[in-house]
Amino acid sequence: MDKPLVIAGRSFQSRLLLGTGKFSSSEAMKRAIEASGSEVVTVALRRVELENPQDSILSAIDTSRYLLLPNTSGARDALEAVRLARLARAAGCEPWVKLEVTPDPHYLLPDPVETLKAAEILIKEGFIVLPYINADPILAKRLEDLGAATVMPLGSPIGSNRGIRTRDSIAIIIEKANVPVVVDAGLGAPSHAAEAMEMGADAVLVNTAIAVAGDPEAMAKAFRKGVEAGREAYLAGLGSTRATAEASSPLTGFLR
């Protein structure tokens, strides 16, 4: 039997985290969240008015059912990310933060140096930090040693829907990590989410692939099933791969 996902001592039954950007409406987002089965919903601090209960995004998220995870999307350096996280806590959010530092607006790749700086500051201030990083096993271990609650390596650039292009590095991170590994960014199809879970990732975070789908609600449900199938396959124990064929039926002793 599977165990729940545990992050910073808090248990979650779902291993699918959901982003809230790019949805056509707050109602479409709300339906997708429900269909996904997710219990963790991340919101960009630059896109919401935390002190406004009528904010179109915040008002669609029932915080009694979902952990609202603020993210520092758009921060270009450590100080900007720290400032955003502090604003969220001052506005009454729980001290959880998805840390994103992306100075390059074209590829949105995370800055490892500034991410490490911001993580160190925020962890010392009592934040539960979930850092978005390149699939760098050394950086992942450094962040874990600092006290990060998870590590969140990218599969491919944010919003690219290209799937897991960093498979070998993510496999090393999974092997070495003692905190949950959440594959984040670039997962464009339920099969990509299943692949991450089959590898042994603890969870995945998906946004664009669901939000821009023709039917976001149906796609959210498909990702939910993909995550569940991948996790079940991992727990069942996947067969080893081979360079040559191996018959599944005997090649001798045929009836004559």
Curated annotation (Swiss-Prot):
Keywords: Cytoplasm, Schiff base, Thiamine biosynthesis, Transferase. The active site is at 98 (schiff-base intermediate with dxp). It comes from the Bacteria. It is an enzyme of class 2 (transferase). The keyword Transferase applies. Pathway: Cofactor biosynthesis; thiamine diphosphate biosynthesis. GO terms for biological process: thiamine diphosphate biosynthetic process. 1-deoxy-D-xylulose 5-phosphate binds at residues 159, 185-186, 207-208. It holds the Pfam family ThiG. Homotetramer. Forms heterodimers with either ThiH or ThiS. This is Thiazole synthase. The gene is thiG.
